[in-house]
Amino acid sequence: MTSKLPDWYSDVAKAGLPITLGIELLEVSGSRVVATMPVDERTRQPFGILHGGASIALAETVASFGAVASIDRERFVAVGQEINGNHIRPKLEGTVRAVGVPVHVGRTSQVWSIEITDEEGRLVCISRCTMAIVERR
């Protein structure tokens, strides 16, 4: 099977919040990002359901990697500027899957739409994330 992860991915995938939450990126490009996240003790809130903040962290991770995949990484960085999410259905256990696609790709910003679904394809959360594209200093 051919990897759907870019060559540069392994250099940036070794630390940070995605590792802590168990987020696994399956496909990364400037036109689509797919990732999964477990619903377990790391990602549930005290009442036993998927924490909304974990869903938002998954959504921003997807948007961030998509934005980074579409820019000149030598000259620019992509940083989260705004994110929102609507939590549609609770999730108690298992895995959620996020698919992100760009809605707008501009010179200084990108807007990504991310749908997070359960194993049956039912919508758990929908999010929109704006990424600022900033020149490296």
Regions inferred by a protein language model and the residue ranges of each:
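Terminal targeting signals and extreme-terminal segments of soluble enzymes
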Residues: M1-R137
